[in-house]
Amino acid sequence: MEAQKPKIALYVQRSFGEKLTATFDFIKENWKPLMKFTTYLMLPLCLLQGLSLNGLMSGTMALGDMTGGSFDSSVVGASIMALVTYYSLYAVLYLLGTVMLTSLVYALVRTYNEREERLEGVTLGMLKPLLFRNVRRVFLIMIIGVLLVLFVGLIVGFIATVIPFMAIAFLFVLLVVVVSVPLAIWAPVYLFEDIYIIDALKKAYRLGFATWGGIVLISIVMGFIAAILQGVTMIHGISGLL
């Protein structure tokens, strides 16, 4: 019988390479529960989102065909309303899917860290309390995040209007980008720990500035990998439209 590998510790200082190794080791060890619970939660949303995207593409093509023929304002108006409806539904489902997937992944990681048995024998019913807790917290982070973006956008717009020198405005935008990097660990801190959202924000900045370069590198690498996987999975759908 193969000996079980040591549990992957969360709260450990690691180099950049060790962070990537720990991430892929966790996925390799727990890909079955990750796949199972993701399918349970995301498949219904994906089906509805696929229908809305199909309606959106069909409506777009139909509207494009109308431009080459006779113009009927009532038909065009109805087609535009249908496009807005399909796109709104697609956006809402995308938002729900992002919230559900984020909440699920962090619930599984926290459960893995707290149980001696790791994720062995974990059921969706066992995850439900933690999952609902994470959903509420992710929505709260999104709301406060949108407010912060609007606030910063107003400040940037005001500075760009008042200060005539574009170099100063550019430096301010660059400063905003630098300060925004620690926000990448705001959600992990808030979802992993039982603390208030403001305390999580303070801790994210304290830890984020200390590991600023690592956060940027991890974000770039993971974003690159996600883009490749997304491109591969979208090939079939795009080829079907050609």
Where do the language-model regions lie?
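Alpha-helical transmembrane segments of multi-pass integral membrane proteins
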Residues: 143-152, 188
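Selective recognition of hydrophobic, aromatic-rich stretches within alpha-helical transmembrane segments
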Residues: 2-7, 11, 81-118, 159-199, ...
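Interfacial transmembrane-helix boundary/kink motif in multi-pass membrane proteins
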Residues: 34, 120-143, 203
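Nonpolar helix-loop interface/hinge motif
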Residues: 2-57, 121-124, 174-241
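Membrane-helix interface segments in multi-pass membrane proteins
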Residues: 46-94, 150-176, 230-242
